[in-house]
Curated annotation (Swiss-Prot):
Organism from which the protein derives: Bacillus phage B103 (Bacteriophage B103)
Domain of life of the source: Viruses
UniProt function note: Assembles to form a prolate capsid shell of about 54 nm in length and 45 nm in width, with a T=3, Q=5 symmetry.
Protein name, UniProt field: Major capsid protein
Amino-acid biosynthesis in keyword set: no
Taxonomic path: Viruses, Duplodnaviria, Heunggongvirae, Uroviricota, Caudoviricetes
Length: 449
């Protein structure tokens, strides 16, 4: 990801080194223009002398170069981060993103008599909400010595090296770290058991295993894109679908070397060029056994909340200190489809149990049905055991997930759906939970919750 001066010129739309000086000069103060002449191929020393004439001119030049020009450059070359295309953009105000998903509603049977009684009954939409907090507040420090600035104007070649060194030291460092943070989102999501896991043989071991991986990847993509949607491939068990053009595959360089892109593109029913845009090659996953990841393009929730350069001069040390601040939201959407292809014998039979609704509000003396979605990797049915914590006498839950709240219940309840994938001697429970807030039943004068 190291930046060359050709990258700098391309991003600024210039062909010569001195064009950068002139770009700064065009928007500079009259004082700057008085001392710094229009630059050309022959007057590098004259330009340098004008910039170095006093601290005011020097400060204006460095501020424009490092802050304004530098940001233009880094925004252009940031696409070198192969994951940058998934960023959502800027969020200049606030530190929290609220993500809302409205799930489909349940079918109801027509009943003419019931219609007379329930015509004005409310049906609250099945709305689910997630919050993403700003979780990166970093800065990058770079010092520019007066002597370094003088040396930069010995020749235009020196000037090119000077600019490239600044960009690499400040902005490129931030870009590399952003790439590592975005990769970490993938590994953290996997370690929390939030991916739908598809178990595969190691595709690097044989041609047969590689072919089987392609088949499973194709089948998964097709299921994610079915018109009616599915609850099977996201961490909130909402019914959603992905457009095939929005399905992206992440693989490491070793697997990429073994894959026939044309075969894989055909498997996804895409032309080669389009498919290559949907395959992102990274240097590797940190999680053991994780071979590939397939996600909807909206899975990444990465926003820039602040990109700002601050500067201060140390007159005693004869240098300038620059501080480039980068604040971001680095997260992933649990509403979006996301699948991990994993190898090894340590893949658990069940990776996640999701209880829906995850949050419920139930009146005293009333009932609420819950559903458990079991994320299994062995294609088997697994028994779900329901329980409720925090309830008073009379509050219970049935074996099929129907919660009955006691008429005098005032506590907040926790509904649990448990799948045990262990043995009698060594149980390994996988638990999904829902929170239930109990409301008073005003029609019966129930106690206030």
């Amino acid at each position: 990801m190291r930046v060359t001066f050709n990258d700098v010129k391309t991003s600024l739309g210039v062909t010569e080194s001195y064009d950068i000086i002139n770009a700064i000069r065009n928007s500079a103060t009259d004082n700057f223009k008085t001392y710094v002449p229009l630059a050309n191929a022959e007057n590098v020393a004259e330009v340098g002398a004008g910039i170095l004439v006093n601290q005011t001119v020097q400060n204006e030049f460095l501020t424009s170069l490092v802050d304004r020009i530098g940001l233009v450059i880094v925004k252009s070359i940031s696409l070198r981060n192969p994951l940058a295309k998934f960023k959502k953009g800027a969020l200049p105000m606030g530190r929290t993103i609220e993500e809302i998903f409205t799930d489909i509603t349940k079918e109801k049977l027509y009943d003419a008599e019931e219609a007379e009684q329930k015509v004005f009954e409310r049906e609250i939409p099945n709305v689910k909400t997630l919050f993403h907090e700003r979780n990166r507040q970093s800065f990058y420090h770079q010092t520019i010595q007066d002597d370094s600035l003088k040396t930069a104007f010995i020749s235009w070649g020196n000037f090119e090296s000077f600019i490239a060194s600044i960009i690499n030291a400040i902005y490129n460092s931030a870009e590399v770290d952003e790439y590592e943070y975005m990769k970490l989102i993938i590994d953290n999501y996997y370690s929390k058991g939030l991916f739908k896991v598809v178990k595969v043989d190691d595709p690097m071991t044989s041609t047969g295993a590689l072919t089987n991986f392609i088949k499973k990847a194709r089948a998964t993509a097709l299921k994610m894109t079915l018109p009616q949607g599915t609850r099977d491939y996201n961490a909130m068990a909402v019914r959603t679908r992905s457009d095939i053009r929005d399905v992206h595959l992440f693989i490491d360089a070793d697997l990429n070397a073994e894959l026939d892109v044309d075969v894989l593109a055909k498997a996804f029913n895409m032309d080669r060029t389009t498919f290559l845009g949907n395959v992102t090659v990274i240097d590797g996953f940190a999680s053991t056994g994780l071979k590939a990841v397939m996600v909807d393009k909206d899975w990444f929730m990465v926003y820039d909340t602040l990109q700002k350069m601050e500067t201060i001069r140390n007159p005693r040390g004869l240098y300038w200190n620059y501080y480039y601040h980068v604040w971001q939201v680095l997260s992933a959407s649990r509403f979006a489809n996301a699948v991990a292809f994993v190898t090894g014998d340590d893949v658990p039979a069940v990776t996640q149990v999701i209880v829906s609704p995850a949050i419920a509000s139930v009146k005293q003396g009333k009932s609420q049905a819950f559903t458990a979605y079991v994320r299994a990797t062995d294609d088997k049915e697994h028994e779900v055991v329901w329980s409720v914590d925090g309830g008073s006498t009379g509050t219970s839950i049935s074996s099929d997930g129907v919660l009955t709240v006691a008429a005098n219940e005032t506590n907040q309840l926790t509904v649990k759906a448990t799948v045990d994938i262990g043995t009698a001697d060594e149980p390994k429970p996988v638990v999904g939970e829902a929170v239930v807030n109990v409301r008073p039943d005003s029609s019966t004068g129930g106690a206030q919750a």
